[in-house]
Amino acid sequence: MTDSTNVSNTENLMKYMSLDQRGSVMAEYIWIDAHGGTRSKTKTLSKAPSSVDELPEWNFDGSSTAQAPGDNSDVYLRPVAMYPDPFRRGDNILVLCETWDSDGSPNKFNYRHDCARLMETHAKEEFWFGLEQEYTLLGPDGWPYGWPKGGFPGAQGPYYCGVGTGKVYCRDIVEAHYRACLYAGVKISGINAEVMPSQWEYQVGPCHGIEMGDHLWISRFLLHRVAEEFGVKISFDPKPIKGDWNGAGLHTNVSTTSTRAEGGIKAIESYMKKLEARHVEHIAVYGEGNEERLTGRHETGNIDKFSYGVADRGGSIRIPRQVAKDGKGYFEDRRPASNADPYQITGIIAETLCGGL
């Protein structure tokens, strides 16, 4: 897909990937940095752990990730979830970690900690989430992959769920990522090409409570790693190309015990009032650069105004027509940007609907 110096030499690599590890296990410790990206490093274990509780804490140089000052740079990694590693396979694992400071407090960029507490506090509500992660594929020059150099493809229209040359780009990456997620046990539920060429979407969920953020972050890590092997960049910018092009979001589907019960549409209506009252607070944690995307055009609501409706993709919240017909189900929060943190999204939704800690 690009110059060979930027991609993996798979044929050469496979000679080494098949070597016997002699009982050792490679554990890829993954964490979220200060900029909403993923970082990782590998630790050798003497045997395969049977649960995440058997994994040791580790640490990293937080001054190199903007998570700690240079004179007190150690940040600790506490494993919270583990998954089969689709790249190394065998007994090797991916380890999702929370970040903690040396004084025993969660790092200020550890949004998972408070989210997990909220989900535990409101466990009786049985929050189910489903996230729709949109992203854009970029070439090494930072321009959307497959677009004319310095130019633009034809207008939007034929690309959404498109099939065929000139309508979709980099399907190999999308398919590889799908398989990697399934192998790792990520609850990926589908994929599709999006409205803007070189933009794609995958869906994760339904997931229960804190599991939503965990699975979404691992899926992002896997996407970056897969694209790395093809020499292609992944952008979660909510408006990567200015002008008459769709932005990228992280639409968030939400249900609770109350909304799924008979007559649950009444609970959904009551939630709308609560969400409207805290619209500004939600926008504050729904991603950077979201003002470029939430303009009231290109299937978005206006960032300054809360609105909702049945089957309305131009509102802040969409209530699916089938939900309105059934009188129960879920709603879709269309405000979050593609680069938003899923822990912050799901956490503030739980807080707004059910109360804080």
Curated annotation (Swiss-Prot):
Pfam families: Gln-synt_C (PF00120), Gln-synt_N (PF03951)
Keywords: ATP-binding, Cytoplasm, Ligase, Nucleotide-binding
SUPFAM superfamilies (alphabetical): Glutamine synthetase, N-terminal domain, Glutamine synthetase/guanido kinase
Record localization: Cytoplasm
Protein name per the record: Glutamine synthetase
All residue ranges annotated as the GS catalytic domain in the record: 111-357
Family: Belongs to the glutamine synthetase family.
Subunit (UniProt): Homooctamer.
EC number: 6.3.1.2
Organism listed in the record: Emericella nidulans (strain FGSC A4 / ATCC 38163 / CBS 112.46 / NRRL 194 / M139) (Aspergillus nidulans)
